[in-house]
Amino acid sequence: MHHSTVLSVLSLLAPAAQASLWVDRAPSYVRPYAIEHYANANALTIGSQTYRFPVTGPSSGNRFTMLMTNAPQSGDLGVLPHIHEQHHENFFCYKGRFQLWAHKGNDTEARLLTAGDYGSVPVDTTHTFQILDPDTEMVGVVAPGSFEDLFYFLATQNVSYETQTPYTPANLSDDAGSGSSADIITQLVSFDVHAALNFTPPRDLVNGSRPAGAIWHDDINEIPSSSGSPYFVASNWGPKYLNNVTGAYQVVQPFVTPTTGEGNFTQGTITLGRRFLNASRQTWNLTDHLALNILEGAVDLTIANETATLLAGDVAFVPGGIPFSYDSRAAFSKFLYVSAGVKGLDQQLLADAAEWSWPVFPTTSP
């Protein structure tokens, strides 16, 4: 290992040894950390929506931003239709329901997303969404990072809820803050938001999807073999792979591949069982950054002799070059992963995995 690489790793380990993994907001520099679900992580409101930012540009070395949006149902769009020319935006439904539209070229796709569903909005794609259930949470991943600056600019107010409630329980304006005046739109261009006000979202969804006959919660959702087009993956209806060589069963379900992420990031879910009897603990040391968002169960994440028990909704960030291990404390755990680059945790697991037809692992150890 080069001397400069050793110094780089030590510089990351030093603050980790001095401070707890648990923080209440994303750090201003790259270090390992964990944030509790609904912590006031730079929380702000835009209309009726409350946004939190467990991973930011500064905390990820500008590789990606992760944001949580909590809001009640609304009869209006959550944001004006718009395009990003430099940012790939990803939508995941943690709970509740929302509708997502994506238009590119001559095609307009739409899906009704429920818990576990995913939608990919690559660059140059017109998109918008509408929140439909009283307790909805969207997990957004935007690459590259620092996209949170847009929301800081648009914020109605910064908030710090004493009770850590998901959002303000009050009848508030549904104005998403993206504005319709030429002045506001011009300012938003600097944040890579280009208004597409001529786009009218179609409402002719059948069984939660558009166009007619689109595969959704009724058959295998394939991931495109090329990049650039929007696509959707229904919960547990995408490709699945089983890894049984790391001391525990792990089922990997990719949403974003090295191809569709254009080499910048990958994303998906990993379902994890308890460690096999007498199996040794696997230690990982990735070349690039990793974020985990727990969806179900409980996961013990160990870094530099500190173990954080992550529960549903919690987020952890592990920088590249930092050794770590993780185990499922529960019989069945599942987390959303975001890996910077193309050599992330998912790719390491997939290298020793086999195609699998089920979202759960086998009944007996290998």
Predicted regions and their residues:
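Short acidic-glycine-tyrosine-enriched beta hairpin
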Residues: E36-H37, S59-R63, N90, K104-D124, ...
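Double-stranded beta-helix
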Residues: L132-A214, S325, R329-P366
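Glycine- and acidic-residue-biased ligand/ion/polar-headgroup-sensing regions
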Residues: E85-K104, R281-N305
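Ordered, small/hydrophobic-rich secondary-structure cores
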Residues: N70-P169
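Short histidine-centered beta-strand/loop micro-motifs
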Residues: V55-G57, L77-E85, A102, Q130-I131, ...
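Long compositionally biased, domain-poor regions of proteins
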Residues: Q130, F147, G273-R275, D288-T302, ...
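Fungal secretory targeting signals
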Residues: M1-S20
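A short, N-terminal "cap"/entry segment at the start of jelly-roll beta-barrel domains
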Residues: A19-N70, L172-G268, G273-R274, F361-P366
